[in-house]
From Swiss-Prot:
InterPro entries in the cross-refs: Ribonuclease_T2_eukaryotic, RNase_T2-like, RNase_T2-like_sf, RNase_T2_His_AS_1, RNase_T2_His_AS_2
Function, as annotated: Rnase which modulates cell survival under stress conditions. Released from the vacuole to the cytoplasm during stress to promote tRNA and rRNA cleavage and to activate separately a downstream pathway that promotes cell death. Involved in cell size, vacuolar morphology and growth at high temperatures and high salt concentration.
Gene this chain is encoded by: rny1
Protein name: Ribonuclease T2-like
GO MF terms held by the record: ribonuclease T2 activity; RNA binding; RNA endonuclease activity
GO biological process: RNA catabolic process
EC numbers, comma separated: 4.6.1.19
Length: 417
């Protein structure tokens, strides 16, 4: 499976093919120093002006961010459930606020995309996708949905990312630029390290004041930051910038908040660790999904549904052909004892198995897979964790994979009899 993924990843995407064609026609190659933006030509700008510090008087909005001239790079600290590396915050987004604190949203329905991963791969930016898979995380386990939401709600409202701002435009190039700049800014703002250097580290016993947290982050940023809490728990930080020039190539200058204020209490802020508390008195136990010594529950028997959950939240079910679906009616499956504590599954379409790593049910399946049950979850070869590329949405279905490979969403499957 990994070799196939590697082969597919090496196939040039549409954008790369267009770029090669441009070179063969005598156009400027993409490595040309005058080409500004991540592989395509961004229009030339004259005198660059700093957004929000300069009033709008008819400037070219391909070179001057307006009306969204106050850029917020926002970061999450999700500890329960734990999301992302234990020694790093994660990305929420990059938001183009108005200079007075207002904002626009969902600004261009014609550029509403639901395939961010494919856009990045097609642009030859698997490196960027890998970074996002590590640091741009959704607490519900649906990273692609968060990426889509951030682009559609906020990215489409950045004036300098309009398609006409590119003199040599390649499809979805502005999408790549948006995510590339957001990840770049995130790495320039190492919140975890900044707090740790000030003696502020995740703890189950130590609490902090709002002044301590804000002071450490604001000094490092060069301007006041906004911190957000939920039930006294530190959860989010917002960094504010004005931009001199376009988002793609402009200079991001730290700025004061645009009216947004911190909501954390003055004292008693909890910075909860992402790692489980080893003190049994707090009731935090690591999640266990593997049971190498065999099944730990009664096998599924009879007629029932296969319900899918991500991050402990129910998110649809499996339908007859074996795909994950979040709308409509769950398919009925029959569980039949195979040997010992194992069983097979079948739907109206036929027996079920993992064919080419994908959960599939159909009359062409000659050797049904044998499953077991562990803590009420479906288990295959001792593992209750399965994987998907993307959570289903509307009428869109998703395949379920047995191996992790390049499938970022983790899920579990329970039996509902």
């Amino acid at each position: 499976m990994s070799s196939i993924s590697g082969f597919l990843g090496a196939i040039p995407g549409a954008q790369q093919i267009l770029q090669t064609m441009a070179g063969s026609l005598g156009l400027a190659p993409l490595s040309h120093p005058e080409i500004a933006s991540s592989g395509s030509t961004f229009q030339q700008c004259g005198k660059l002006e700093l957004s929000c510090q300069t009033s709008y008087h008819g400037q070219d909005t391909c070179c001057f961010n307006y009306p969204g001239g106050q850029m917020l790079q926002t970061q999450f600290w999700d500890a329960d459930p734990a999301v992302g590396p234990e020694n790093s915050w994660t990305i929420h987004g990059l938001w183009p606020d108005h200079c007075n604190g207002g904002f626009d949203q969902f600004c261009d329905s014609h550029r509403k995309y639901s395939n961010i991963s494919l856009i990045l791969i097609d642009a030859g930016r698997r490196d960027l996708l890998d970074e996002m898979s590590t640091y741009w995380k959704d607490y519900r386990g649906d990273d692609p949905n968060l990426w889509e939401h951030e682009w559609n709600k906020h990215g489409t409202c950045v004036s300098t990312l309009e398609t006409h701002c590119y003199s040599e435009y390649y499809p979805q190039q502005e999408v790549v630029d948006y995510f590339d700049k957001t990840v770049e800014l995130f790495h320039d703002l190492p919140t975890y390290m900044t707090l740790a250097n000030a003696g502020i580290v995740p703890s189950y016993t130590q609490t902090y004041t709002r002044h301590e947290v804000e002071d450490a982050l604001s000094k490092a940023h060069g301007a006041t930051v906004t911190v957000r809490c939920r039930s006294q728990r530190l959860q989010e930080v917002w960094y504010f910038f004005n931009v001199e020039g376009p988002l793609q190539t402009g200079k991001f200058v730290p700025s004061e908040p645009d009216g947004q204020t911190s909501n954390c209490p003055a004292k008693g802020i909890i910075y909860q660790p992402k790692t489980p508390n080893k003190d049994p008195g707090h009731g935090h136990e690591p999640t266990k999904t593997r049971h190498p010594h065999g099944p730990t529950g009664a096998p599924f028997i009879g007629k029932g549904n296969l319900v899918v959950s991500t991050m402990g939240q129910q998110r649809g079910c499996i339908i007859g052909r074996g795909t994950w679906y979040s709308s409509g009616t769950c398919a009925d499956f029959r569980a039949k004892r195979a040997s010992g504590d194992t069983f097979t599954l079948s739907s109206r379409k036929g027996p079920c198995a993992f064919k080419d790593d994908i959960f599939t049910c159909g009359s062409y399946i000659s050797s049904p897979a044998e499953f077991s049950a562990e803590d009420g979850k479906l288990s295959y070869h001792g593992n209750t964790t399965f994987f998907a590329d993307k959570a289903p949405k509307g009428k869109v279905q998703s395949d379920i994979f047995v191996s992790e490979a390049d499938h970022p969403i983790e899920l579990s499957i329970a039996w509902r009899g």
